[in-house]
From Swiss-Prot:
Protein's name according to its UniProt entry: Cyclic AMP-responsive element-binding protein 3-like protein 3-B
Membrane topology term: Single-pass type II membrane protein
Encoding gene, per UniProt annotation: creb3l3b
Biased composition (Pro residues): 93-103
Cytoplasmic side: 1-286
Cross-referenced InterPro entries: bZIP, bZIP_sf, CREB_ATF_subfamily
Start and end residues of each stretch annotated as Leucine-zipper: 252-273
Annotated segments matching region Basic motif: 212-241
Keyword terms: Activator, DNA-binding, Endoplasmic reticulum, Glycoprotein, Membrane, Nucleus, Signal-anchor, Transcription, Transcription regulation, Transmembrane, Transmembrane helix
GO MF entries: DNA-binding transcription factor activity, RNA polymerase II-specific; RNA polymerase II cis-regulatory region sequence-specific DNA binding
Gene Ontology terms: cellular component: endoplasmic reticulum membrane; nucleus
Biased composition range(s): Basic and acidic residues: 385-402
Glycan attachment points: 389
Length: 428
């Protein structure tokens, strides 16, 4: 620590030699007005390599016009001071020499010594002051005070160099190192792997890899827990839906069972009704009814084709025609006598005297005498009594006609027994 304090004292003397307002070398140069820029303040916990410090002060003292090639590092945005990206390691592997486009530059002009310095400089990346010693080396001083870290303010080269002046050793030990805070999961995993990490930064590459590995495991564990939680919620939802569907299915099964029971009862009632109908019906009556229906149907079918007793059929076809022929008939004596009286009106009185008379004979005689009188009149000379006397013949024809042949036969009963036969009796 004494070595650092000695180097700090020599640096102050050098700055007083350069920038003292009374007798300094650069007292006539207004550096603040020439390059009055806003210097953004970032994380002060950064360190510059000794090679970079040496190049800067060699250019400042030796008056060289070369630009320092030492890069300026930016701190990691991680909470532990290291990057979580496995492809970036700003502490151990410096970035390329390309300077950012908005990076401020400091130009130092020296009239007497012709010293012009134009180099990239990032004040926010300076963690400690860099002061040259007598042997030409550089060393690290204290951290920049937090009171000077504002968002933007104009600075001169002297202010920049004075801001890096060393502080006491107690402040260096308190401010230059950030405490490493580990969670319970990280501590448990480190203990499980048998690894220990220091309580303060900076960490070595191996320790950083171990810490990244532990934190990656914790992230994977958390993501796995979240996925398991979502899966569990999804499965719970499916189970609830399945329970609801099962309850609905049981309800439907119960309704189906009730409908089946109702159907069975209805079928049983139908069987009973059929049995009652079959037992109450008379089978012979049913058979007789069927026979009558069959006979009626046959009769209705065959009756229009038969018609054996109708006169229209005989008259239409002309197969038979009625003929009046003399058939065998029995004539009584009185009828023969009437016919003879018509032929011989004068012989009727003689025959009447001979034959005994009955009451019927008197009637017949009266009829015969009446017919004879009519025949003797001149207007009835052409009158044929036989052709007009059709009372007996028509009566006999209507009642004694042959229905098959159509012949008409006249039958006359003899009123007297033992009388003699008529002349036409031999026609039989």
């Amino acid at each position: 620590m004494d070595h650092y304090s000695d180097q700090g004292g020599d640096g102050i003397e050098l700055l007083d030699l350069l920038f003292d307002k009374n007798d300094g070398i650069l007292r006539y140069e207004n550096m603040g007005q020439q390059n009055n820029q806003l210097w953004p303040v970032q994380d002060p916990h950064m360190m510059m390599t000794p090679q970079g410090n040496e190049d800067f002060f060699n250019a400042l003292i030796g008056g060289s016009d070369s630009v320092s090639g030492s890069p300026v590092w930016s701190p990691s945005p991680s909470d532990s001071g290291i990057s979580e990206d496995p492809h970036s390691d700003h502490i151990d592997s410096p970035p390329p020499n390309a300077s950012p486009p908005m990076e401020p530059h400091i130009v130092v002009s020296q009239t007497q010594h012709s010293l012009n310095i134009n180099f990239p400089f990032d004040f926010n990346g300076w963690e400690t002051g860099f002061l040259p010693d007598q042997s030409g080396g550089t060393q690290c001083a204290s951290e920049t005070p937090q009171a000077q870290q504002t968002t933007g303010f104009p600075l001169t080269v002297k202010d920049l160099l004075l801001s890096g002046t060393p502080e006491p050793a107690a402040k260096v030990s308190q401010q230059s190192y950030q405490e490493l805070i580990l969670t319970e999961d990280e501590k448990r995993l480190l203990a499980k792997e048998g690894m220990t990490l220091p309580n303060q930064f900076p960490l070595t590459k191996y320790e950083e890899r171990i810490l990244k590995k532990i934190r990656r495991k914790i992230r994977n564990k958390q993501s796995a827990q979240e996925s398991r939680k979502k899966k569990k919620e999804y499965i719970d939802g499916l189970e609830s839906r399945m329970a609801a569907c099962s309850a609905h299915n049981h309800e439907l099964q119960r309704k189906v069972f009730q409908l089946e029971k109702c159907n069975i009862s209805l079928m049983e009632q139908l069987r009973r009704l059929q049995a009652l109908v079959m037992n109450g019906s008379n089978k012979p009556v049913q058979a007789g009814t069927c026979v009558l229906v069959l006979l009626l149907s046959f009769t209705l079918i065959l009756l229009p084709n038969l018609k054996p007793f109708t006169d229209t059929k005989v008259s239409q076809h002309g197969d038979f025609s009625p003929m009046r022929v003399q058939s065998r008939s029995l004539h009584n004596l009185q009828s023969s006598r009437v016919l003879r009286n018509l032929d011989h009106p004068y012989s009727m009185t003689e025959n009447a005297k001979i034959l005994p008379r009955f009451p019927e004979d008197k009637t017949m005689e009266e009829i015969a005498s009446l017919l004879g009188r009519l025949h003797r009149r001149p207007q009835f000379t052409e009158y044929d009594p036989e052709s007009h006397n059709h009372s007996f013949d028509q009566h006999d024809e209507h009642h004694h006609g042959d229905p098959i042949t159509g012949h008409v036969a006249t039958v006359t009963l003899n009123p007297r027994r033992g009388s003699r036969r008529s002349p036409h009796a031999d026609d039989m």
